[in-house]
C-alpha cells in the first residue's frame, strides 16, 4: 500500500480497488483478474463479516486470511502481491453495549486482525455506544481511534510494521448499505477533513503514537458518490474541487466508500482527484447474482424439469423464510419486496449465498450445465458481453468461467480508473 500511495503522491495517476467481499468466487475473480498483471490486489473484510467471535461469516481474522490464501494458492496468485485489509474496525458490532465493554472488544478485534497479518487497518470509532451522546464529539472519536491504533502498534511485529498502514475517518452509511432511498449526498467539506486529521494527530500524539502517524495513508471522506436500492448518485468532480485540493497539502490520499456502479470515467476522475482507494462490494456480488440468474435461465432451456436445480425458487424460499438480512431495508409491499430481493443494487442476496440450501442448488446448477454444451446463441441471449468475449477467443464457455468473467466486468471498470495506461 505504501508504494502505491507514494507513487500517487509523486504525481502518478494510480489508485487501487479495494475488494470488499467474502464470497469465494468474487475473491477468485479478483485474483485471476490480476494474476499476470503484476498489480497488487487488496481484499478487505469488515468487522461485522469477520471478527474475534466469528462475525456473520463464521470466520475469525486468521480464518479469513487462510480462506483467502487458500484461494490464492489454487489460482497461483503470489502472496507477496496480496494485501489484506480490515474495514470499519472498531465498535460497529457493539454499539448497543456500554462504552467500556464495547471498547474492550474493539481493542481485541484490532489485535486479532493485526496478529493475523492484515496490514491495512481502518480505525473507525465513530459510532455512539449505549451510554454515549449522539453525535459523538470528534475528539472522543479520535481518542478512541488512538486507543485502537495503540492496540495495533503493540501487537504488530517489527516486520509487520514495515507494511502496516492506517485509514482514519468515516463519512459513509452503516456498513452493509443504505436502509432507505437517497436523493442527494453531502460532500465532505475540506474543513471537516482537516478537523478529522487534526483531532487524530492530537489524540495519537497524546498516547505517544508519533511513529504510527507516519503509517496513516488515507482519510475516509464522502466525495459525492452513493447508491441505494434503485438509484445511483454519480461523481460530480466540480462539487468536490475544494476537498480534492486540500489533500494535496498532506502526505495522504482519500479513501472513497460506496463507489459501486460508478462509470469507468468516474473512477478515473476520482483517482485523478486523489480518491486513490476505491472500495467496491455489492457491485461485485450483484454481478455474481446476474450470472447465476442468467445460468438459471439457460438451465431452464437445456435441462429437463425434474433434473433442474430450481435455484431461483430456492433463493426465494430461503429469503422469504429467513428475512433477517433484507426485511428492514426493502419495501414492505410483497410485489415490490420481490423486485428488491431479486434486483436491488444494494444486493442483500449476498448474505444468503452461504446458506446450505442455496449453496447446494448453485452447485447443482453448475453441475447440470457442465454436463451439456452451452449453445452460443443461448449465451448471447442471457450473457451478451461474455458472448463477445467468447467470439474474441479470450473466454471458454464453462459455467464457472462465465461467472468469473461476469464479475470481472466490474473490475475492468476499476482497472481503467486506477491504471493510467489502460485505454
Swiss-Prot record:
InterPro entries, sorted: Aldolase_TIM, GatZ/KbaZ-like, GatZ_KbaZ_carbometab, TagBP_ald_GatZ
Coiled coil spans: none
Keyword terms of this UniProt record: Galactitol metabolism
Lineage: superkingdom: Bacteria
GO BP terms in the entry: D-tagatose 6-phosphate catabolic process; galactitol metabolic process; phosphoenolpyruvate-dependent sugar phosphotransferase system
One cellular-component annotation, GO: plasma membrane
Pathway where it operates: Carbohydrate metabolism; D-tagatose 6-phosphate degradation; D-glyceraldehyde 3-phosphate and glycerone phosphate from D-tagatose 6-phosphate: step 2/2
Entries under Pfam families matching the protein: GatZ_KbaZ-like
Function: Component of the tagatose-1,6-bisphosphate aldolase GatYZ that is required for full activity and stability of the Y subunit. Could have a chaperone-like function for the proper and stable folding of GatY. When expressed alone, GatZ does not show any aldolase activity. Is involved in the catabolism of galactitol.
PANTHER family in UniProt: D-TAGATOSE-1,6-BISPHOSPHATE ALDOLASE SUBUNIT GATZ, N-ACETYLGALACTOSAMINE PERMEASE II COMPONENT-RELATED
Subunit annotation: Forms a complex with GatY.
Family: Belongs to the GatZ/KbaZ family. GatZ subfamily.
Protein name: D-tagatose-1,6-bisphosphate aldolase subunit GatZ
Species the sequence originates in: Salmonella gallinarum (strain 287/91 / NCTC 13346)
Amino acid at each position: 500500500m505504501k508504494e502505491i500511495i507514494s507513487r500517487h503522491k509523486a504525481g502518478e495517476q494510480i489508485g487501487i480497488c479495494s475488494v470488499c467481499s467474502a464470497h469465494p468466487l468474487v475473491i477468485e475473480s479478483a485474483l485471476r483478474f490480476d494474476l499476470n498483471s503484476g498489480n497488487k490486489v487488496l481484499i478487505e473484510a469488515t468487522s461485522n463479516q469477520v471478527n474475534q467471535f466469528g462475525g456473520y461469516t463464521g470466520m475469525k481474522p486468521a480464518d479469513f486470511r487462510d480462506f483467502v490464501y487458500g484461494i490464492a494458492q489454487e489460482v497461483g496468485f503470489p502472496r507477496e502481491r496480496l494485501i489484506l485489509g480490515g474495514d470499519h474496525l472498531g465498535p460497529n458490532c457493539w454499539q448497543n453495549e456500554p462504552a467500556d465493554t464495547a471498547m474492550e472488544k474493539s481493542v481485541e478485534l484490532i489485535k486479532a486482525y493485526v496478529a493475523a497479518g492484515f496490514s491495512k487497518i481502518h480505525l473507525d470509532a465513530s459510532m455512539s455506544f449505549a451510554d454515549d451522546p449522539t453525535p459523538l464529539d470528534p475528539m472522543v472519536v479520535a481518542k478512541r481511534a488512538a486507543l485502537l491504533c495503540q492496540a495495533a502498534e503493540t501487537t504488530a511485529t517489527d516486520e509487520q510494521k514495515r507494511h502496516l498502514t492506517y485509514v482514519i475517518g468515516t463519512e459513509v452509511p452503516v456498513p452493509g448499505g443504505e436502509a432507505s432511498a437517497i436523493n442527494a449526498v453531502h460532500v465532505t467539506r475540506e474543513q471537516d477533513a482537516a478537523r478529522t486529521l487534526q483531532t487524530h494527530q492530537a489524540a495519537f500524539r497524546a498516547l505517544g503514537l508519533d511513529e504510527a502517524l507516519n503509517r496513516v495513508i488515507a482519510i475516509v471522506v464522502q466525495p459525492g458518490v452513493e447508491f441505494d436500492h434503485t438509484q445511483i448518485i454519480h461523481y460530480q468532480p466540480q462539487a468536490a474541487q475544494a476537498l480534492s485540493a486540500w489533500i494535496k497539502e498532506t502526505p495522504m490520499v482519500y479513501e472513497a466508500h460506496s463507489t459501486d456502479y460508478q462509470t469507468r470515467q468516474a473512477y478515473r476522475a476520482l483517482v485523478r482527484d486523489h480518491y486513490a482507494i476505491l472500495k467496491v462490494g455489492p457491485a461485485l456480488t450483484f454481478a455474481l447474482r446476474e450470472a447465476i440468474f442468467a445460468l438459471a435461465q439457460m438451465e431452464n432451456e437445456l435441462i429437463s424439469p425434474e433434473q433442474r436445480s430450481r435455484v431461483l425458487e430456492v433463493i426465494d424460499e430461503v429469503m422469504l423464510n429467513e428475512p433477517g438480512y433484507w426485511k428492514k431495508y426493502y419495501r414492505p409491499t410483497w410485489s415490490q419486496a420481490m423486485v428488491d430481493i431479486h434486483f436491488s443494487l444494494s444486493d442483500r442476496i449476498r448474505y444468503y449465498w452461504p446458506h446450505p440450501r442455496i449453496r447446494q442448488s448453485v452447485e447443482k446448477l453448475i453441475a447440470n450445465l457442465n454436463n451439456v454444451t452451452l449453445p452460443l446463441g443461448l449465451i448471447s441471449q442471457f450473457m451478451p458481453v461474455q458472448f463477445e468475449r467468447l467470439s474474441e477467443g479470450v473466454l471458454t464457455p464453462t459455467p464457472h468461467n462465465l461467472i468469473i468473467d461476469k464479475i470481472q466486468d466490474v473490475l475492468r471498470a476499476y482497472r481503467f480508473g486506477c491504471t493510467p495506461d489502460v485505454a
